[in-house]
Amino acid sequence: MVELNIIAGKKAERLNVPDKWAELDGRQLKLACLYRTLQAGSTRNMLETARRIIRASRRMWRRIPPAQKCLMCEELLGFILKDTPSFRDNKIPTVRAGLRRLRGFDDMLSDVTWEEFIYADTFMLRGMYREAISVLYRPANPLTGKRKPFSDTELSRNEKRVGHLDDLTITALAVNFRAVRKASVEEKNKHLFPPTDDTYIDGEQVKADSSKPQAPSQAAGWADTHHLLMGDLAYEERKFLDSKATTIVCWINRRIRESKERERRKA
């Protein structure tokens, strides 16, 4: 957080302003998504959205000259436009869709099954955000407060529930999931999610190599990866599908790393 002191005339206001995605709460995350879309639109609307993100009072905000507001926004909220969102906690754990409240995944995707991840992440890769959110946000069990177990037979019903959500909310939920995915899956499994530029993994300089096993492409999704993993273990498919997604991804990453180590020893 950055401490901001706004002084206009005899009035002063002290604010704690987030300076990275991880410091935004759910409401600010939604506003940040709106702020992004307004960059090519109305400056007035963009500045009002910025005011709501930093939580400055309207009275104080009106006292600041427009040019100074723009400079302030560029300095304080530049991370919204420049940085890729990455954080481990679910900023929007619940969302109201019509008359029902839907519950999302736990922090670090700790309650997301491999089957659920296959569906949700494949939808995300293809830009089908509403379908992805219908997988991730489901009615909660009234006794436990946890989401009801994922079932592909409930997809059409869940899509109807999510249909009540506006586009901005869907965008915020998608950004939220992708940020948690990046911090909890991508950044922890560098062999499965190889770099696009030269970098170091386990102390060795590597380059992205399309001939090596990688995370799925936009067209293929995770289904092909899953079937390749099963091989002769088809009889254990349900066990895999019900396992934690983070566990399976970590296992795939380890297999890729071990395969590379064997290749190095042979060379």
Regions found by a protein language model. Name each.
Residues 1-267:
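An amphipathic, hydrophobic-aromatic interaction surface with interspersed Lys/Arg
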